[in-house]
Amino acid sequence: MIRVLLIDDHEMVRMGLAAFLEAQPDIEVIGEASDGSEGVRLAVELSPDVILMDLVMEGMDGIEATKQICRELSDPKIIVLTSFIDDDKVYPVIEAGALSYLLKTSKAAEIADAIRAASKGEPKLESKVAGKVLSRLRHSGENALPHESLTKRELEILCLIAEGKTNKEIGEELFITIKTVKTHITNILSKLDVSDRTQAAVYAHRNHLVN
């Protein structure tokens, strides 16, 4: 049986969820909490397999409750079940440790399936939320600094260039041939989008890559 804890400040929501879930052959509701602080206490006390978490509640909200539960328990499986898909709700609770994010407009069977998936460590995201997360990942990639694409070896060579080392000195320090050094430098210049080693050195200092 999958042991589930419900955390929601609306009694009717908890009653409806509990009635549906208890009718499932493989799911058991082991506790209900009406706010975040009570939810944290019950989560620690009962160690449920899966937690259904509302976000907007009086007192401690779902984001803070998720943070605290993730600090107290090892790898808790938290499914957010809410009416909100605002950025200031979605990202903080996922970053806090929530595994899945569903809307209260989801079909009952979808919630049950998400619970079963969560018990195996498999996430389920409402399609609009998945779109938001993917968009954010794409944008974070677009905003990445050029040197973040350098390999460890290329970063080493960039730092040595910034220290004023010649190709020969770099090769001797890293035990590689001058030809290999030149190949790495060509790649470095391309990735940093600079035209020569002087500009590469300036970039390294500007981005605090060398002391």
From Swiss-Prot:
Keywords tagged on the record: Activator, Cytoplasm, DNA-binding, Phosphoprotein, Transcription, Transcription regulation, Two-component regulatory system
BP-aspect Gene Ontology terms: phosphorelay signal transduction system; regulation of DNA-templated transcription
DNA-binding listed as a keyword: yes
Upregulating conditions: Autoregulated. Induced by antibiotics (vancomycin, bacitracin, nisin and ramoplanin), cationic antimicrobial peptides (human LL-37 and porcine PG-1), Triton X-100 and severe secretion stress.
Cellular compartments annotated: Cytoplasm
Domain HTH luxR-type positions: 143-208
PTM notes: Phosphorylated by LiaS.
Keyword Transcription on entry: yes
Transmembrane segment boundaries: none
SUPFAM superfamilies for this protein: C-terminal effector domain of the bipartite response regulators (SSF46894), CheY-like (SSF52172)
SMART domains: HTH_LUXR, REC
Annotated GO MF terms: DNA binding
Main location: cytoplasm
CC annotations in GO: cytoplasm
Stretches assigned to the Response regulatory domain: 3-119
The protein's role, per its UniProt record: Member of the two-component regulatory system LiaS/LiaR probably involved in response to a subset of cell wall-active antibiotics that interfere with the lipid II cycle in the cytoplasmic membrane (bacitracin, nisin, ramoplanin and vancomycin). Also seems to be involved in response to cationic antimicrobial peptides and secretion stress. LiaR regulates the transcription of the liaIHGFSR operon.
Name listed for the protein in its UniProt record: Transcriptional regulatory protein LiaR
